Amino acid sequence: MAKEIILTGDRPTGKLHIGHYVGSLKNRVQLQNSGDYRSFIMIADQQALTDNARNPEKIRNSLIEVALDYLAVGIDPLKSTILVQSQIPELNELTMHYLNLVTLSRLERNPTVKAEIKQKNFENSIPAGFLIYPVSQAADITAFKATTVPVGEDQLPMIEQAREIVRSFNTIYGKEVLVEPKAVIPKGTIGRLPGTDGKAKMSKSIGNAIYLADEADVIKQKVMSMYTDPNHIKVTDPGQVEGNTVFTYLDTFCKDTETLEEMKAHYSRGGLGDVKVKKFLNEILQAELEPIRNRRKEFQKDIPEVYRILKEGSEKAREVAAGTLKEVRETIGIEYFNNIF
């Protein structure tokens, strides 16, 4: 029986943080090690350039950081194909063909794109490359004939747009060439881990993220300065657990649920200080992140080897994408010279 094919990845705009780790990276490693899937993991540098075109150095520098984070958490290049988007030129031609099947109004209606346009203050001047990136994403997915795409809920509209493109292509040309992917929200993952300041999203620019590469003292400093319940002023005050960032992290990382529930009850009725709770969280995070940090340092000793992994993975992925593009070109009827020379 053929394995399911997975495509997933990240934009290289900085080092990866623990939000990425619990939101997707741990799940990727589990899927990889299950042996049930063929995994393609993309570093989407071209997509990152759609809103960083004037700062390409940021993307170049982040590429190797993301690769190191992948290897550190356990993504194995012998089991998963790690690729760099810009090294697969076939993706660009597929994007061009798919653009002919999508209207401008449909792109503008995509809820994910609309939200990101507002977030990035692009309302008055939307880069064309940014607006069409859902089509580029459809090219990424279909190039490798991915059957499964693990995503968060906010990315579901992107997968639906890819499915529409697949259906349009197959219907117009009367041939089932492209595979319609299904979106899967990984079980056991949290939605989005808030920043250490309690804001909805971790962000490098805000400085509210704990990175996989952070040293132990940096992690401790970030944990001890985390946002808690502003009304929990004295130890004896009853504290609010719900919406308390420290407890949100504990819900995510603490495996001792009995101890955690006792701690929540104690905090809620009063008598348990924030410092003690934060120290408990720090111990848990240190135990989780120390092995990852140590593996990262080992890979960092041989950066040329990391680039070799990326190059070999990209070459392997390109062979697959080239096969899909050939099918697409033949189906459209633009392989003009095949039967002549």
Swiss-Prot record:
Could you name the domain of life of the organism this protein comes from?
Answer: Bacteria
EC number in record:
6.1.1.2
* Subcellular localization: Cytoplasm
Chain residues that bind ATP? 11-13, 19-20, 152-154, 193, 201-205
Where is the motif named 'HIGH' region mapped on this chain? Answer: 12-20
Query: A Gene Ontology molecular-function term?
Result: tryptophan-tRNA ligase activity
Chain residues that bind L-tryptophan: 140
- Which cellular component, as a GO term, is one annotated location? cytosol
Matches recorded under InterPro entries: aa-tRNA-synth_I_CS, aa-tRNA-synth_Ic, Rossmann-like_a/b/a_fold, Trp-tRNA-ligase, Trp-tRNA-ligase_bac-type, Trp-tRNA_synthetase
**UniProtKB keywords:** Aminoacyl-tRNA synthetase, ATP-binding, Cytoplasm, Ligase, Nucleotide-binding, Protein biosynthesis
Q: Which BP terms from GO are recorded?
A: tryptophanyl-tRNA aminoacylation
Q: Which SUPFAM superfamilies match?
A: Nucleotidylyl transferase
Looking up Pfam families in the UniProt record yields: tRNA-synt_1b (PF00579)
| Residue span of motif 'KMSKS' region | 201-205
**Keyword Ligase on entry:** yes
Catalysed reaction(s)?
tRNA(Trp) + L-tryptophan + ATP = L-tryptophyl-tRNA(Trp) + AMP + diphosphate + H(+)
This molecule's function is given as: Catalyzes the attachment of tryptophan to tRNA(Trp).
Q: Which HAMAP family does the protein's record reference?
A: Trp_tRNA_synth_B
This protein's assembly is summarised as:
Homodimer.
* Similarity-based family: Belongs to the class-I aminoacyl-tRNA synthetase family.
Write the protein's name. Answer: Tryptophan--tRNA ligase
Q: Which species does the entry assign this protein to? A: Clostridium longisporum
